[in-house]
Amino acid sequence: MEQDELLHQLVDPKSPINIESLLDTITALVNDCKIPVLMRMKSVDNFISRYERIVESVAALRMKATDFRQLKVIGRGAFGEVHLVRHTRTNTVYAMKMLNKDDMIKRADSAFFWEERDIMAHANSEWIVRLQYAFQDPRHLYMVMEYMPGGDLVNLMTSYEVSEKWTRFYTAEIVEALAALHNMGYIHRDVKPDNMLISRSGHIKLADFGTCVKMNSNGVVRCSTAVGTPDYISPEVLRNQGKDSEFGKEVDWWSVGVFIYEMLVGETPFYAEALVSTYANIMNHQTSLRFPDEPLISTQAKDIIKKFLSAAPERLGKNNVDEIRNHKFFKNDEWTFETLKDATPPIVPSLKSDDDTTHFEEIETRDRDNASDFQLPKTFNGNQLPFIGFTYSNEYSPVKKLLNGASSNGVQNGVENKPVVVQQPLTNGHSTGIPEEQYEEVVIELDSKKRELESLKDSISRTEIRAKLIETEKNSLSSKINDLERELKDNKERLRLGADSDTKVNELSVELRMSKEYNGEMENELSKFRDKCEQLKEDLRKKSGELAQEKNETQRVLQQKKNAEEAFAEIKRDHEMLQTREAEKSLQLKKALDERKENGAYQQSVAKATDAEWERKMQYYEKQLEQATDDRKREEQKRTAAEFDQSRVARKLAGIEANYELLQNDYTNMKEARKDLERDLQDVIAEKRRLEIRVEQLMDSRNTDERVLNLCQEELLESQEEAKYKEDGLRGKIDGIRNELENEKMKSQTLEENLIVADKERGMLKMEVQELMQRHKWEMANKEQNLKHIENQLEELKEHSRIESTEQESNDKKTIADLNKKLELEKAHKKAVINKLEEEMAKRQPLKKGDKGITKSALIKKEREIVGFKKCRTGRILMSLQQENQHLQQKMTEMYMDSEKQGEHFSYQMQEMSQLIETLRDELKEYKDEYPQRHSVNRYEDKRSLDSREGIPTSISHQNIQIDGWLSLRDMTKKSRKPKVVFKKKSDHQLTLFFQWTNYFVILNEYAFTIYTDEKHLNSVVLTIEAGAMAHVRHVTSADLRNVDDNQLPKIFHIMYDDTSSNSSRHASNSDLSICEPREEGWKRHDFQELSYHTRTYCDDCGKKLSDFIRPTPAFECKNCHYKTHKEHIAQGTITMCRYTGLSRELVLMGTHKEVCNQWVSQLRRFIEASRPANVSVSRVSSRRHVGGPGSSA
């Protein structure tokens, strides 16, 4: 029983100790232990020596990447690529995913491939992509899956208008796929159209199980990170990121609801430009879920979407999948869930061949990066251990070969991708005299000898490589010795010049000693190689003797074959003699019959007995003849088999002889190389001795030079001390006199410079104040004149509007009265005509002479005709009257709407003029209030320096701020369910929305930031942001604008400004979705929300990265000003104050180039900083211009 249980675990593909896993284990151990540091240990070296060749032979027989011919790259991800491949043996087309082991080991959460491999390998469902093979090499993992030539649903959504009927069909299939996945105990967590592939028949299958996680016994998962695509992630997963939480399979049903909405509407239900806004919409899904007016969506579709996109406890499908299958949305007359797999899909992909890739995007082929191999470790690190047990085969493997062989009572050897077929001997030894067992032993021994020769050849080649390495080391050592000699010469020269070279000489001595030690090590290694070469030579002699024995054995086999042929010839001669005897017996029988006929009836009785005897003899000879014929056929077969064996043995002998000659040549070459190495080594030894003598000479000369140098240095120090003592005395006297002269000179220069600067400052200040007063007087006069002109225009517009409205009302009343009169006259006329007609029809004509009287039946018939005619005529007249009435009412409605539009237009113009007048009045009042202050400056101009600018307006302090140009504008605060978008497809198969940008001409000066519609028409202002209203400017990141082209992102910047004229409640947040509650005082007015960034994003506080593909750092983002920071900065209190005031508005602008964007951001920051500190400067914040712009009304 125990043996049966062990055998069952060995052949079970789901068992962790099956045969494939054991082969993976021994391969991984050999690869991880085969490093120089570990091979110094005797036990590891013995292990590698025993199993290295076995592992290499097993790897050559198992499935590998070269068994598939790569056709095209059809997908690329973070860990690897997906290739379209064709199996070289069966010509079947597959999709092969190739994953890099090194990348997966570096990532913390990279064990996703186990779930993906197990689900696809063991899923028994037609709705899940099937795994055919899984194998590995030291660098990569390979998963060979069935090819889905129809592409994904994203490609279908971009190519066709998806109807509700199509949505129903594809939703039913994805429900079946998720039901199968949940029954296996897994949750997908990333259900989206990108992971739904279309098969050759048009049905879809679920794929990409890298995000799957195993449920526990309660059907839930405990996780602390939010995994999935932002647009499809459920609120319970998003709410609990950063802390452990439990959720079940209902998270997949949420994604199905988003998928149905996207199929019907064309975009996801909670989409927003910024990632934080998307998360906010998901968290507040009760109010943010809305259905557009176009396209029309049925009540059943809306109901199932609402039930999917609901709270987790109430979500459809939480209890079981039958709740979903029984929903009214899936009711139709074409298919049911039982017949779904046999139903006709809406679209069957058109394919030109089995490897057609027209439904996939073109992906650029990359060269493989050889630098991504595992670095050579310094100790055992087990790089291959995490991948033990990954190998799998759905078609054939050693396990299935064993099972199939056991069922047929004959175990056949097989390997995963190259099954070995053992050819049975063609003879059984009866004809040649060689026993079958002995013949098989000869063949096996020949194969083993061949393998030993090959291994010997490999060892010789490795020895040759090591000899070349020794040669290289010798050359490097020679060059190093030459360098040391040159360095010694240089140091000697430096000694003569007085440089301190003791340290250098010591270092050279140490290096020379190290080189001697290294040379000794090389000599020892060379001696080891000599011993190994001698050992290899001895092995070669043994192998030669064994080869000679094999030749003798082969000759013996040939001699036995010759004897067999001679025996066959003798049997053939015996057969010919039997044929001759048979012919003679036939002639004797014929003669006896003739004699019997001549003798007559007398001898008939005797003849009968003779005939019976002859018949028995004839039967006996016929049997002997048949037996001889069979023997001859068997001998023929044996001879043919012996000839075949002879040719096979001859071929093997020829191969062995050729290998032997090659081995002899290699051995000769190796001997010559060894002699060359010995000669080179002698040269190196001689050179080393010469260098040692040279170094000793140099050391002696260095010691002599050191003694001479020390004497010189002592004398030089004495003379230097005497000269320094005298120099110090003279220098002190000279410095005192020089300092006195310089002090006097500096005092006089300072007084002169101060006098000149004061005069210049006084003159410049006087000119600036006079110029400022003149300019403001001129501006005040222009403002007053403009104000009067605008007031006159306003009065004229009011009068004109009043007159036009009065005239229009009178005209409308008159027109309505005329139309009513016409309607009454027409009704009276029609009524009179109808009455006249009825009267004429109702009249009865008098009888003429000769006419018969009208019968009662004819009278009834006539009355019926009159009634029918009257009804028909009345109906037509009433219909025409109704149509005419509707036409008149429609005309009156249009006239009334035109009058209302004109009234609204006039009122809008009047409102704009009123606002402009109020603005001008405010500015005029400010100038009037400021005029006395400027006038008072003139009285104290002689007491002020150039740096005291409290009374000068802000425009002077930053008058060099001037920039203009074309920018593309898009408003972030504009809400629209159907934005103007262009759909594109990225390399990761994601449907992306790229917004259209509108070009405007923008001017920034010392007063305001103004946006115009055109460069030539500067009077058409779109938006004006004045100096005090500008709050914040920054560059955007991919987290702010997710669906923007990567090339456009560096050219975009974000502006925040105040809008006091707008209602603050309109800008308030409709929901508070901050996960970290309650708010802390250290947030500095920010409304933070904790997020995880998977795209490239940086901290606004320290500038370091916030993002990571798998496990990003904890981060916060303000929902108002989009300030991003690390979590620890909030605790440290280093964050800046939020610039959002509750009345702030936002703009997103894009420059033509990255440099243009940087220039605008730099100038705007100067503009903001310059407008803040002015205490007595001209305040322009109150004079807001409420001019409508694209998406804003600043």
Curated annotation (Swiss-Prot):
<feature type="domain" description="AGC-kinase C-terminal">
    <location>
        <begin position="331"/>
        <end position="402"/>
    </location>
</feature>
<dbReference type="GO" id="GO:0008270">
    <property type="term" value="F:zinc ion binding"/>
</dbReference>
<keyword id="KW-0723">Serine/threonine-protein kinase</keyword>
<feature type="zinc finger region" description="Phorbol-ester/DAG-type">
    <location>
        <begin position="1085"/>
        <end position="1138"/>
    </location>
</feature>
<dbReference type="InterPro" id="IPR046349">
    <property type="entry name" value="C1-like_sf"/>
</dbReference>
<keyword id="KW-0547">Nucleotide-binding</keyword>
<feature type="domain" description="Protein kinase">
    <location>
        <begin position="68"/>
        <end position="330"/>
    </location>
</feature>
<feature type="coiled-coil region">
    <location>
        <begin position="875"/>
        <end position="933"/>
    </location>
</feature>
<feature type="active site" description="Proton acceptor">
    <location>
        <position position="190"/>
    </location>
</feature>
<keyword id="KW-0479">Metal-binding</keyword>
<keyword id="KW-0863">Zinc-finger</keyword>
<dbReference type="GO" id="GO:0048598">
    <property type="term" value="P:embryonic morphogenesis"/>
</dbReference>
<dbReference type="InterPro" id="IPR011009">
    <property type="entry name" value="Kinase-like_dom_sf"/>
</dbReference>
<dbReference type="InterPro" id="IPR015008">
    <property type="entry name" value="ROCK_Rho-bd_dom"/>
</dbReference>
<dbReference type="GO" id="GO:1901888">
    <property type="term" value="P:regulation of cell junction assembly"/>
</dbReference>
<feature type="binding site">
    <location>
        <begin position="74"/>
        <end position="82"/>
    </location>
    <ligand>
        <name>ATP</name>
    </ligand>
</feature>
<dbReference type="GO" id="GO:0072518">
    <property type="term" value="F:Rho-dependent protein serine/threonine kinase activity"/>
</dbReference>
<dbReference type="InterPro" id="IPR008271">
    <property type="entry name" value="Ser/Thr_kinase_AS"/>
</dbReference>
<dbReference type="Pfam" id="PF00069">
    <property type="entry name" value="Pkinase"/>
</dbReference>
<keyword id="KW-0217">Developmental protein</keyword>
<dbReference type="GO" id="GO:0005856">
    <property type="term" value="C:cytoskeleton"/>
</dbReference>
<dbReference type="GO" id="GO:0007266">
    <property type="term" value="P:Rho protein signal transduction"/>
</dbReference>
<dbReference type="GO" id="GO:0000281">
    <property type="term" value="P:mitotic cytokinesis"/>
</dbReference>
<feature type="domain" description="PH">
    <location>
        <begin position="961"/>
        <end position="1171"/>
    </location>
</feature>
<keyword id="KW-0597">Phosphoprotein</keyword>
<keyword id="KW-0418">Kinase</keyword>
<comment type="function">
    <text>Negatively regulates mel-11 to relieve the inhibition of mlc-4, allowing contraction of the circumferentially oriented microfilaments in epidermal cells and thereby regulating myosin II contractility during spermathecal contraction, cleavage furrow contraction in early embryos, and embryonic elongation and morphogenesis. Required for P-cell migration. May also play a role in oocyte cellularization.</text>
</comment>
<dbReference type="InterPro" id="IPR000961">
    <property type="entry name" value="AGC-kinase_C"/>
</dbReference>
<keyword id="KW-0460">Magnesium</keyword>
<dbReference type="InterPro" id="IPR050839">
    <property type="entry name" value="Rho-assoc_Ser/Thr_Kinase"/>
</dbReference>
<comment type="subunit">
    <text>Interacts with rho-1.</text>
</comment>
<keyword id="KW-0808">Transferase</keyword>
<keyword id="KW-0862">Zinc</keyword>
<dbReference type="InterPro" id="IPR000719">
    <property type="entry name" value="Prot_kinase_dom"/>
</dbReference>
<dbReference type="GO" id="GO:0032956">
    <property type="term" value="P:regulation of actin cytoskeleton organization"/>
</dbReference>
<dbReference type="GO" id="GO:0005524">
    <property type="term" value="F:ATP binding"/>
</dbReference>
<dbReference type="GO" id="GO:0030866">
    <property type="term" value="P:cortical actin cytoskeleton organization"/>
</dbReference>
<dbReference type="GO" id="GO:0106310">
    <property type="term" value="F:protein serine kinase activity"/>
</dbReference>
<keyword id="KW-0963">Cytoplasm</keyword>
<dbReference type="GO" id="GO:0031032">
    <property type="term" value="P:actomyosin structure organization"/>
</dbReference>
<keyword id="KW-0896">Oogenesis</keyword>
<feature type="domain" description="RhoBD">
    <location>
        <begin position="784"/>
        <end position="846"/>
    </location>
</feature>
